[in-house]
Amino acid sequence: NDTVHDFTKDPIETYIDGYWVKAKGTTLGADNGLGVAAIMAVLEDNSLKHGPLEALITKDEETGMYGAFGLKPGTLKGEILLNLDSEDEGELYIGCAGGIDLTATLEYKEEAPAADLVARKVTLKGLRGGHSGLEINQGRGNANKLLARVVHDVLIEFDSQLASFEGGNMRNAIPREACAVLVFNPEDTEGLEDYIKEYEAQINAEYAPIESGITLTIESVDLPAAIVPAEIQDNMISVLMACQDGVMRMIPTVPDTVETSSNLAIVIIGEGKAEVRILARSSCDTMKEFLADSLTACFAMAGMKVELSGGYSGWQPNVDSPILHAMKLSYQQQFGVEPAVKVIHAGLECGIIGANCPGLDMISFGPTLRSPHSPDERALI
């Protein structure tokens, strides 16, 4: 914030710190300025011997991949695509996940609670969260899933009613926190408090050592003016319990790599409306469609209206890719070690470009970068 810089005209001030190239007070722009620089270097070097080349430089990759979406079929003449947007030297990427957003909504008529009831707010915190693609396979807890389970059991054990439920705030992040307001008989107060305390210990035991420090607290709040009708309450908690969350399938041909997953990202219930948002991912487009259909059916059974949006294609890995074998051989000859072959469970432009230009043999690689999109960004020399 203390750096005055006009990115439309001011040059990036770079310097070398040990083995790293850094920028003074701004982002370095190596993601993906280094890729563009590499393309320009090849194009201007007349001493290099190679066949016909095309240079594809897209816009807005970080904010929505709009350039890749705008690529028309038939624009590219080449049959091989070298994507330069990966961030670890020595790694070759041969696949990525596509995604689709699911939003389920329901409007309902609120009811007034009996005046002699009391209310408590139950809050679940302390989860690690993380990226819903890259870290979905870590076994971390989802706050929306866990709190739905808690509320489900409380509704069975105690004569209680749901007033509101809220958790998560980003579709591509595993939710770390969630809270619910419950209404019940005053004589059950001590029993409910003890139950919540025991539940906290149970959840921590289940998720140790992946999660450490999950808290489940209960606090007194004013009696709300409205609660969720019993039938709607039961349907909503049931669908949150039943819907797919986490890893659904691994890639058969690439060990220890997620193919298909979903993230129960955002839940808001209250004030006469329920809304659930899920991000589904898969490197296999047909599996992504199957997951979206399965989730749609699940929420439809709860009486919710479902809308799918923001879909983009995945890049299904081909372990027999000719460019993969050529790149592996070239890397071994140059550096004496075999490169790592990976699939990323997140979006790359390759998925979109491959859908617009079928038949491309694609691979993604690049230099080692750290802390992109921040003033701490650096590129390894």
Sequence positions of predicted segments:
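Active-site-adjacent substrate-binding region
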Residues: 142-165, 317-360
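A short beta-alpha structural unit
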Residues: 170, 180-181, 215-227, 265-267, ...
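Short amphipathic alpha-helices in soluble, non-transmembrane regions
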Residues: 190-204, 290-299
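Hard-cation-handling environments
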Residues: 195-259, 263-271
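Zn-dependent metallopeptidase/amidohydrolase metal-coordination segment
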Residues: 252, 259-274, 335-381
